[in-house]
Amino acid sequence: MKSEHFKTELITNVSHDIKTPLTSIINYVDLMKKEKVDNKTVQEYITVLDRQSARLKKLIEDLMEASKASTGNIKVELEAMDATVMLTQVVGEFEERAKKNQLDIVVDSPEPPVKIMADGRHLWRVIDNLMSNICKYAMPGTRVYISLEKFNGMVIMTFRNISKSQLNISSEELMERFVRGDSSRNTEGSGLGLSIAQSLTGLMNGNFAIQIDGDLFKAILSFEEVF
C-alpha cells in the first residue's frame, strides 16, 4: 500500500514538474506559428513541435488523472442523469472521426429517460475514452455496435468492435496502466485510457468489464437504474 502511494505521489509530482516547462514550449510554438516563415523545412519543424508537444501534454494529463482516479483522490458528484442522452451526445462527437477511419457506428438504445446515478464529467470521460480506443484500434470497414439496455434493475452499456489485429492479451492485462492492445505501438496513445475508465466507473459505484475473444473487443459498463 505504501509502495502504491509512493508511486502515485511520484507520478503526480513529476507530471506537475514537467507540465510547467511544457506550457512554455507550447506558448513559444504558438508564437512561432503566427510568424511568417517562408522556409518550408522550418514550417515542418514547427508543425512537428506543435503536434508532439500537444501529444506530451495529453500524456501528462492522462498520467495525473490516472494517478488521482486509481487512489480515489478525485472529486465525484453523483446525480441522477439520463444515460441515453449522455451516450448519444458522446458518440455523436466521434461521428466524423469514425467516418474518417471507415467505421460504421450502430447505436441501439431505448427511448429516454433511462436514469442512473453518475458524475456527468467523469461518465463523459469514460465513454470518451472507450470511443477513442475504438477509433484507434477497430478494423477499418467494420461496424461498431453500441447498445444500452435495462436488465434486472441495472443499466448496461456495451461497446463492441473488431480489432485491427488479434488481441493476444487477457482483459486483465489490457486494463493495466500503460498497456495497449497494439503491441507494435503503431498508434499514438498513453495506454492509460481503459485504466482511467475503469477507475472512474468504480468511483461512481458502477462496474467496468472487458471481454476479449480473438479479435472481438467488448467493453461493458453497468450502473444501477434509478427511478
What are these regions (language model features)?
Residues 71-76, 115-118:
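Conserved micro-motifs of the catalytic ATP-binding
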Residues 205-214:
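Glycine-rich ATP-binding loops of the HATPase_c
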Residues 77-91:
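A conserved beta-strand-to-alpha-helix junction within the catalytic ATP-binding
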Residues 141-153:
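Short beta-strand/loop element within the Bergerat-fold HATPase_c
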